[in-house]
């Protein structure tokens, strides 16, 4: 396990799990640079490049965080076999991703265990 200011990092089989901390309950603009930097750093270091972002503590994010997710996803996709999934989303956050059809790009899982099992299996 590795701790940063805004996220904790875990390994589960071949999957790197990035769990946003309670400081990220409301992912507003003033946090995005720091959170984005930590996510990018962790995504870059993930080997193999299979990452689950656990958003269980996040109740709100806007378009700025979606842009961060795109940057993280692009970084992961640069490596062979790169995959990104999101898990444990609060209803509002899940709805945002479904309305924008980003759930087609990034698989959404109800629980961290479901996400890790799916990515370890494939």
Predicted features and spans:
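STAS-typified acidic loop motif
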Residues: 2-37
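Short acidic-hydrophobic, aromatic-tinged amphipathic segments that line or gate anion-handling sites
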Residues: 106-112
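Receiver (REC) domain switch/output surface
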Residues: 119-122
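Amphipathic alpha-helical interaction surfaces in cytosolic regulatory modules
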Residues: 26-106
